Amino acid sequence: MSNGENGHNLGNAAHLHANVTRRRVLRWSAAGGAVGLGATLLSSKPWRAALADAKPYKLGTEQPLTGVAAYGGKSSLVGVQMAVDRINKSGGINGRPVELVVADDQSKPDTGRRAVEKLATEDGIDFHVGGFLSNICLACTPVWEEHKIVNMIGVCLDTTLTTSKCSRYTFRTFDFAPAQAKAFAPYLVRQIGKKWHILYADYSWGQSTRDAYTAEIKANGGEVVGSTGIPLGTADTTSFLSKIGGDFDGLFLIFFGSDAINVVNQGTDLGLAKKYKFAGDGAVATSTQLPAMGNKIEGFVGIDRYLPVFDAPLDTPELHSFFDEALGRLKKVDPSGPLPDRYVQSNFEAVNALKLGVEKSGFQGRNDTPKLIEALEGLTMKAGPDFPTGDKVLRKDDHQVFMRELIYVIKDGTYHVQQAVSWDQTLVPPACHFPAA
């Protein structure tokens, strides 16, 4: 895998790397303040002394803080840290504080596997929230199973994680491609055009997302006339893009980070945006990437679970509060001030879902993992400060959440919501078969 990075998006990644490669564990501050990533906020409430003396829960988080996905790892870590700080400020979980152990997977599956093995053995974590690149999530699944540790996925979107390769120990508290495709395909076919060519990142997430959209576009009367995979980290994509042509209506893009920037910018320079409508997964146009694409992303139609705007139905107190706090935290690690994105949101809500499960199960340590799994299966999450994107249910059959989807268009450099699709309109049948307990 390439380790090429987009400098604009990485922001202060080097600073983050310096703070986390020592695998720092969050420690209590007697003064009740926090400094950078190495401390946790405490308030001066009466329970403060008792909370500080209680045995902490150890929460591990594996993130790509260097390498091709570093920009997303930065946002993801902000989401985890934000949730942990809020939990500790409000009294912890079951009267116990939460300590965070951070590991850098360097955007590499082998490094990621070694990192989570160390989290499980040497660091002795109780549970885990994180994972960005799907190939790394898949590589780490056996570690969670071997050590019987609950794993709340932070970002990984590969379809198989909650279908053919599902695990009793792994949960995804946000959407996935089959649900997005079911929500988006009718709009693509009826509002844009019937014939599509799919351009995708040629690894597990891109491939499974390609398959999901191919199926749903066909189910809605459309046609996928071709597909083109581009390896991760390809700086010059023109050799792939220049071969695309023919009679079809739209190019559906499945990329993230610098790869998305390269495909959009280079594809526009080749004239593809004049010939075909650009649409795609929301990862193509996250808020951290928009500046690097400028007006070349104008008119792009995408789908996402979270957008940093307040068009209806997003103008809620919970989303305003989430936005304001996340924005302030992002500015501390990247002075350019990137807006909150889907990666902050999904990691933030994953920690809060885990908190509910720990409270419900009375989890005390890894021996209680079966109780925690049972508490998380079918867990109901209600819209509010902990779940600003709205109500959702964690399905027992496959440990997959379904949630509201937002179809948007990029105009004048920002998002404009065109349609909100309720979670119940995104449901797909479970395709997971857990091994016998």
Task: Please name every model-derived segment.
Residues 1-24:
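N-terminal secretory signal peptides
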Residues 17-18, 24-46:
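N-terminal export signals
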Residues 41-64, 68:
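C-terminal segment of N-terminal export signals and the immediately downstream linker at the start
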Residues 54, 71-78, 91-163, 173, ...:
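Beta-alpha junction/loop-to-helix N-cap segments that form part of ligand/metal-binding clefts
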Residues 114, 159-160, 167-270, 313-321:
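Extracellular/periplasmic Venus flytrap/periplasmic-binding protein
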Residues 119, 123-132, 152-154, 197-200, ...:
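Periplasmic-binding protein-like
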Residues 267-348, 361-362, 421-436:
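Extracellular/periplasmic periplasmic-binding protein-like sensory domains
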Residues 329-344, 348, 355-417, 436:
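Segments of small-molecule ligand-sensing domains
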